[in-house]
Amino acid sequence: MKKGITNGKANGLFGSNDSCTRAQIVTFLWRAAGSPAPKGTAKVPADVLPGSYCYDAVAWALENGIINGLADGTFGVNNTCTRGQSVTFLYRAMGTAPTTVNGFTDVAADSFCADAVAWAVENGVTNGTSATTFSPNNGCTRAQIVTFLYRA
């Protein structure tokens, strides 16, 4: 919060155990990158309203290949960000190709997040939820996301 990457919620609380939405993580990444102005080249999905807190962040992330929209054409502003999505966004924003292969039984080699998971574990961003599982479809809390950002 000191660096302005995240904000608290109402009543002076951070909401550590609250689910982190896709809009929130992208906004955190955008702020960590210095809040660069988008170039105006991205087709921003209709569920990201102009003037909303995340509009510029989503536009920037789309322009830089950090995120994609969902299959239904939306961004999923209020959807909970999963572990697989969160490490993928971080990897695309900050990562370099991993030198190892992820060894988790629940992350297939052809999964959208396979390289990102390997990168995140290799670089100490996060671990699996057990020795053999990563749980890529589990939601992330705000505390987990800011921890991932700090470690990345």
Mark where each language-model region is.
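Short glycine/proline-rich, acidic loop/turn segments that cap or connect secondary-structure elements
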Residues: 116-123
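Feature responds to low-complexity, polar/acidic, surface-exposed segments characteristic
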Residues: 2-3, 7-26, 30-56, 63-84, ...
